[in-house]
Amino acid sequence: MFSLNTIAPALGAKRVGKRVARGIGSGFGKTAGRGHKGQKSRSGCKIKVSFEGGQTPLHRRLPKFGFKSRKSIVTQEITLFDLSRIPENVIDLNVLKKYDIVSRKIRFVKIIMSGTFDKPVIIRNLRISKGARDLIKSVGGRIEEGE
């Protein structure tokens, strides 16, 4: 009968660990496979991955570059296609958050022209690209700026 306490791995599936420093006959006696002297033979030996033998490591030889703007965390671009999915006529930041077009942490939004747009809407206090501005005005929309 098969039971949980009789389950065992297949023969040869588990390797037996190497028993080092257990006499000459084992093949790993005396120095335990570490060789004689030197940094790697000592206990507690751990050499950094980036260590290059005293030579200045690659990560310090290469120049620093770039940065991640913290402004990008609170800024997002949206397209006119995203606006066309909103049923309301007046669109501001709160409306975009309400319809999950932008996340809660976003504070600045820029509308860019992408796709077609044929709904006259009023855009309040949002940044807008020149192409998108022209398209919204051509379909009878309005852009209101300022607080």
Swiss-Prot record:
Note the superkingdom of the native organism: Bacteria
Q: Name one GO biological process term.
A: translation
A GO CC annotation recorded here is: cytosolic large ribosomal subunit
Respond yes or no to whether keyword Ribosomal protein is given for this record.
Answer: yes
What GO molecular function annotation could you give as one example from this UniProt entry? rRNA binding
Q: Is Disulfide bond tagged as a keyword?
A: no
**InterPro entries membership:** Ribosomal_uL15, Ribosomal_uL15/eL18, Ribosomal_uL15/eL18_sf, Ribosomal_uL15_bac-type
Query: Which keywords label this protein?
Result: Ribonucleoprotein, Ribosomal protein, RNA-binding, rRNA-binding
The residues the entry assigns to the signal sequence are none
Q: Name one Pfam family in it.
A: Ribosomal_L27A
Task: Note the SUPFAM superfamilies from the entry.
Answer: Ribosomal proteins L15p and L18e
Q: Which NCBIfam families match?
A: rplO_bact (TIGR01071)
Q: How does it assemble?
A: Part of the 50S ribosomal subunit.
Briefly state the protein's biological role: Binds to the 23S rRNA.
The record's family statement is:
Belongs to the universal ribosomal protein uL15 family.
Q: What is this protein called?
A: Large ribosomal subunit protein uL15
